[in-house]
């Protein structure tokens, strides 16, 4: 029964993503041919917006110790609004005591997934399966989970989605540098 429910939910997500993909291609192309026929490869194109107003970058892929981090951390005050970096479908949300703490994961039409971690407990204002627009508020920043202070953990992954806790750089799992898509 659960397997069937998962298949139904996945089909629903795929339908929503396909509609978003069509809308984005229409908006991006404006009737023009971009030369390669593929408007969904956004390297450095501004596909993603900065998910938070203000804040300073406290980690950009690596911690100050040199250890790989795989995300951009924006140091901001607790309660700062966090926004969807691009249109997509909310895949999951949770309020965990460890790891990402309060987090949201959004799948985008081009195959990217964006992760927003360490939000304020109870501040998530979207639900799994919900379609969100670029710039829509999804939660408030905080310091939940494995966090050393108030900030937004902003991580981006590409399909197929894998995670390697021992990775020492981008390319060793599905995490990519978010700056390449902003």
Q: Over which residues does each language-model region extend?
A:
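Terminal peptide-recognition signature
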Residues: 57, 74, 88, 135, ...
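Zn2+-dependent peptidoglycan hydrolase active-site motif and core
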Residues: 67-70, 84-130, 144, 150-158
């Amino acid at each position: 029964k659960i397997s069937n429910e998962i298949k139904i939910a996945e089909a629903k997500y795929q339908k929503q993503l396909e509609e978003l993909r069509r809308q984005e291609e229409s908006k991006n192309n404006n009737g023009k041919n971009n030369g390669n026929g593929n408007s969904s490869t956004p390297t450095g194109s501004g596909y993603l917006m900065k998910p938070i107003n203000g804040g300073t970058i406290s980690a950009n892929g690596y911690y100050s110790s040199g250890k790989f981090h795989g995300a951009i951390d924006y140091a901001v005050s607790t309660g700062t609004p966090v926004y969807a970096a691009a249109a997509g479908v909310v895949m999951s949300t949770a309020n965990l005591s460890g790891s990402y703490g309060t987090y949201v994961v959004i799948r985008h039409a081009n195959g990217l997934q964006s992760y927003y971690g360490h939000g304020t407990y109870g501040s998530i204002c979207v639900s799994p399966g919900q379609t969100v627009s670029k710039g829509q508020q999804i939660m408030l920043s905080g310091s939940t989970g494995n966090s050393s202070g108030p900030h937004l953990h902003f991580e981006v992954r590409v399909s197929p989605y894998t995670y390697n806790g021992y990775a020492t750089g981008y390319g060793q799992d599905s995490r990519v540098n978010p700056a390449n898509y902003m």
